[in-house]
Amino acid sequence: MSLILEHVRVNYGRNNILADINAQLEPGQIVGLIGPNGTGKSTLIKSIAGVQAYSGTISWQNAPVNLRDIGFMPQNSRVEAELSVLETVLLGKHDRLGLRVGSAYIDAAAAILEDFRIGHLHDRCMTRLSGGQQQLVLLAQRLLREPKLLLLDEATSALDIRHQMQVFDRLNAYVARTGALVVIAIHDLNLASLFCDTILMLKDAHVFAYGRAQEVLTEGNVAAMYGVATRVTVEEGAKHVRLLKEG
């Protein structure tokens, strides 16, 4: 029941955006997709979602990925200007408004908004929200569907650190409850080390490193990826590493 990537390639003319990507991602975890800008993180997520042309094979639960059966939040997701927060979240269950929505779905949507500390905004128009608040609403929309595969491209980039940690706490709880697989492109290595079970590093269109966070987020790997010196510390009894820039 894994997400399997076999020899996945994406080319724009003569430029290799992704070159022979191979990985097997198991459900029941958060996978952090990291790497410098321009290494193909967004392209890989879009390829998995099936909205980007690629060569090779991508399968989920032994079948091609069906966008209608997964959760996909691309970078800079569009919001419907005239909809309220609650209406926007409910679109996660129905593709269009006007359909009869049961009270159970309304209650579930309201509960997710409360989890994200924005329940008080339920009747506010989406265009009156900050960028970070819009991201929270759009993530709530994806979670309402309860997908077994959730693909997130920089889904917390407009949030401050406190709200980012709240989102990851919510994602961890979601994974624990549903056994879903969450794949998220993320730049913050400290957040990746704290909340991601597995790390997939991309560099120069290839998989540079892949494995458990403790094994992959090393001083050598980070220095080779980003060209910066780091110190990696592991607190006694802690599950994850923390990355600190030297200086």
Please report, for each region that a protein language model flagged, where it lies by residue.
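Conserved structural motif at the start of ABC-family nucleotide-binding domains
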Residues: 3, 18-20
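Conserved ABC ATPase signature
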Residues: 125-129, 133
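The feature captures the beta-strand-to-loop junction immediately N-terminal to the Walker
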Residues: 34-36
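ABC ATPase nucleotide-binding domains
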Residues: 223-247
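Conserved ABC ATPase "signature" region
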Residues: 104-121, 138, 146
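Catalytic Walker B motif of ABC-type/P-loop ATPase nucleotide-binding domains
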Residues: 150-154
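Helix-to-loop junction immediately C-terminal to a conserved catalytic motif
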Residues: 49
